[in-house]
Regions:
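Start-transfer (signal-anchor) and selected internal transmembrane alpha helices
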Residues: 1-25
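Extracytoplasmic catalytic/substrate-binding loops of multi-pass membrane glycan-assembly enzymes
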Residues: 26-44, 50-62
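Juxtamembrane "helix-exit" motif on the non-cytosolic side of transmembrane helices
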Residues: 30-38, 66-69, 115-125
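Short hydrophobic/aromatic helix or loop-helix immediately within or flanking a transmembrane segment
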Residues: 50-77, 81
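Membrane-interface micro-motifs in multi-pass membrane enzymes
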Residues: 52, 56, 79, 83-86, ...
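Membrane-water interface at transmembrane helix exits
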Residues: 63, 67, 95-99, 144-151
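Low-complexity, highly charged intrinsically disordered N-terminal segments
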Residues: 71-92, 99
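Membrane-interface alpha helices of multi-pass inner-membrane proteins
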Residues: 154-156
Length: 156
């Protein structure tokens, strides 16, 4: 028996989500299965680096929430899975925002989102990769809401 909620999801969204996950695994598998340590990862073992002082206030709040679930452990495969899921959801929101109907372009958009150079560079700092993926998701969500519901400053 098929799930009715799954059947309601459009084919474009399914293709975008699965392509983003699949291409992300292919592109970043080495980083997610190996612990590559850089200068910042050694220094920031027990905390997320400069937060409030650099204007990254949400990073501090999110790291406190993540501490409740994971402690101070940096597990690249776990963080990588969360990161890929967040980027896949963001890619699906981009498809909805631009009302894309071509399945090949939807798949390409998901692939571009997950292999973009900033995503690859963020994976070098794996202990904050999921925080920046969440930030990207929030940006795409805001863009989607503005385009769909025409929210502007004058409506507030």
């Amino acid at each position: 028996m098929k799930n009715k909620n799954y059947m309601k999801i459009s084919q474009e969204i399914k293709i975008t989500f699965l392509t983003t996950i699949f291409i992300g695994i292919i592109a970043h598998l080495y980083m997610y299965t190996n612990r590559i340590v850089n200068h910042d990862a050694v220094f920031s073992v027990a905390f997320s680096g400069s937060t409030y002082t650099n204007g990254r206030w949400l990073l501090e709040l999110m790291s406190k929430v993540a501490y409740l679930f994971n402690g101070n452990y940096v597990t690249p495969w776990g963080i990588g899975a969360i990161t890929l899921i967040l980027y896949a959801i963001a890619a699906c929101l981009l498809v909805k925002t631009f009302n894309m109907k071509n399945k090949y372009i939807c798949g390409c958009l998901g692939a571009i989102v997950v292999v973009y150079p900033t995503v690859t560079a963020n994976n070098l700092y794996i202990f904050t990769a999921h925080y920046y993926a969440f930030a990207f998701l929030l940006v795409t969500l805001a863009t989607y809401l503005i385009s769909r519901y025409n929210y502007t400053m004058k409506n507030i």
